[in-house]
């Protein structure tokens, strides 16, 4: 057994020398070999120790050797790594420090969460983004994380991400308002400031979808206005009421839901405005169902056509897709597949020079289970190739989109 460990130690030493090579190809070969090794505890601790060293600069930030050494070890972690990364943290470069924080925020261990908060305290003012691992998907240890992490909202760059974490912990009923402690008044002030920013903002172009600064503001504001529902304060309630006049239906929806949590009913016309908006219709309905308040949802939008349209639009607004709500969208056909339904739409976007040239384009939403109709739940085939509508017959558009997706999912299942 000792001989095996000795060989692995020698191999790590040899690879370490290659990691210091001026040749990127040699370095990449060495890091790949390390990635493929089955590191034991001692070998992992040794690799973590090596991460303290300086290596030749990488072409791209993601190629940083020190950070990748941390990632290699923490991909298959041992509890012993927690105290080790704590001890070497101050000697690491900024990229490697981020990798350490990501590890501690991902490892489902109480000691790791304590170390995460401790190390975050050292560098939070220097962060541009908050490394929070899988805490959104798997929120845990609220008694460790809060209220301590709220101090770090002093760094405006990461404040909205910390509030997003807090929002998730509220949503999972892991915290209540008492956990805010001395930070409650600051959170209230931050919400009020965000309301002022939104209400006073002047969009710099014909459509806010072309205003990157506003899109960043709207993304952050959604977190604040959603969080506001858990902060019972008259000043917050008044600020939420102000937002009922905002033109952005996404922000208006968050404000309306939060007002309901405060015990105030939004006006009927405001509810109709929100439900009439394709981007947020399904979010709004699902939120009301979760709250047990679906009775206020307008019947005119409680049907499968409207839910399918919203599902299509929600897919289209992704930055990697259309990146905006289409100016027009029309249902062209419904295709049945046993108990499932697919909705074929055409849409166009005249407010964008790039998309205007494409004219009407085809997209499919669904499939939706007819047995649960009307439902907002699509089964994963919502998609568009952004092909011109006139380039194919409706049936051909449907087969082109759904056929390709079915092949993709089948190949994925076979791998």
Regions found by a protein language model. Name each.
Residues 39-49:
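N-terminal, post-signal-peptide region of Sec/Tat-exported proteins
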Residues 33-37:
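Amphipathic, non-membrane alpha-helical rod segments
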